[in-house]
């Protein structure tokens, strides 16, 4: 007896196919044989509720608003496919109405790559469940790449240079913003104006802080080969002190 398409999908998500050819052979005869979705979405159901008496269930709502999405339950979350560029726009209203958190995956090149894409998407959705997360109810995996990386490195104080650990202690005890200044200075390509804009402060204040970073805290800003270490270290500090929200990227700012 042929297996259903959902069984092939769950087997694929579980990494049960040894090759793309094996997957294609097994899925032949189902809609998956000629199926080319743009992406998929994961919907967290922890706080799901139906707000009104007689309201259609979430599954019916998804099928009505996103045709051919084939929603099904996988490991406690709703998994569904997206085909059109505007499909993701529908989620904001649904997230508000049904109290959902929704993660949109990176683009799908081949259905055989679903296990890798799913792993990242599931970790990103877990990040959205974090009590420190106060971002939008609908996010893309691309938006969460940086905080997700830092989440996976959380607690690795051994990756933070000693001079940055001392800087973090100074910020914490004195209420200063040297770690934030260093982060924005590095990510803004050493532009005083852009760093000032990011911090909502004057460029002269930024210049003063940069000089103190070099002279008083011995941060090696004149050594380009150390900039990657500095950026990673200060990012880990800020992730611990400010949480994932500090690193959220909004779609309108993406190139």
Predicted regions mapped to residue ranges:
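Cytosolic nucleotide-utilizing catalytic cores of signal-transduction proteins
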Residues: 7-255
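CheY-like receiver
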Residues: 1-4
């Amino acid at each position: 007896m042929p297996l259903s398409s959902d069984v092939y999908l769950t087997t694929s998500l579980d990494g049960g196919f040894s090759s793309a050819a094996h997957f294609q052979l097994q899925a032949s005869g189902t809609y998956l044989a000629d199926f080319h979705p743009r992406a998929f979405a994961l919907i967290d159901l922890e706080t799901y509720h139906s707000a009104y008496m007689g309201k259609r269930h979430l599954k019916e709502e998804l099928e009505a608003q996103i045709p051919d999405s084939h929603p099904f339950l996988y490991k406690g979350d709703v998994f569904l496919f997206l085909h059109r560029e505007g499909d993701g726009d529908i989620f904001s209203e649904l997230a508000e109405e049904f109290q959902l958190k929704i993660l949109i995956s990176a683009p799908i090149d081949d259905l055989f790559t679903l296990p890798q894409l799913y792993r990242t998407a599931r970790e990103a959705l877990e990040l959205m469940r974090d009590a420190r997360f106060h971002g939008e109810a609908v996010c893309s995996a691309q938006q969460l790449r940086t905080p997700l990386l830092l989440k996976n490195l959380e607690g690795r104080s051994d990756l933070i240079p000693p001079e940055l650990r001392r800087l973090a202690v100074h910020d914490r005890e004195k209420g200063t913003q040297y770690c934030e200044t260093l982060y924005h200075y590095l990510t803004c390509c050493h532009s005083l104006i852009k760093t000032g804009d990011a911090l909502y402060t004057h460029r002269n204040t930024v210049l003063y802080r940069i000089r103190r970073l070099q002279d008083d805290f011995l941060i090696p800003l004149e050594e380009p080969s150390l900039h990657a270490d500095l950026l990673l270290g200060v990012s880990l500090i800020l992730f611990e002190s400010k949480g994932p929200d500090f690193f959220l990227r909004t779609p309108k700012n993406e190139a």
